[in-house]
């Protein structure tokens, strides 16, 4: 049996969809939703605002929800390595998730370990996955 301690929930209160779309009454909804997640025993949350600037979207939300979400918080897909380290060191994120960066850089770990620059993701890179 898979328990709530083995489940991570991913939510997207902001998205790039022909421009930035943000959930109406975002903070009120998130506060209620996260309290319910907590009551269910969920302890891992991935806050994704895919294809948008972290500091303009999920970074702002993360700073607010830390007050009522004391559990594992994951996010930051658009962050650089240095920005990600800073968000973790400041206690805003527990883990950083990179998807597009890994697709663009199959040798992601090696590049990060050596401090080498990462290629920018381009939507055409998705074609090689099919």
Give the location of each predicted region.
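Flavin-dependent oxidoreductase catalytic cores
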Residues: 1-130
């Amino acid at each position: 049996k898979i328990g709530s301690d083995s489940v991570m929930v991913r939510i997207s209160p902001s998205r790039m969809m022909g421009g930035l779309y943000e959930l109406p009454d975002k903070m009120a909804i998130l506060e209620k939703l996260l309290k319910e997640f907590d009551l269910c025993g969920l302890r891992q949350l991935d806050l994704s605002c895919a294809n948008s600037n972290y500091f303009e979207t999920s970074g702002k939300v993360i700073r607010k929800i830390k007050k009522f979400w004391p559990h594992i918080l994951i996010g930051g897909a658009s962050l650089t390595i240095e920005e990600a380290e800073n968000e973790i060191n400041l206690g805003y994120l527990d883990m950083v998730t990179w998807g597009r960066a890994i697709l663009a850089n199959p040798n992601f770990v090696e590049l990060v370990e050596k401090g080498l620059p990462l290629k920018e993701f381009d939507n055409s890179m998705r074609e090689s996955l099919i």
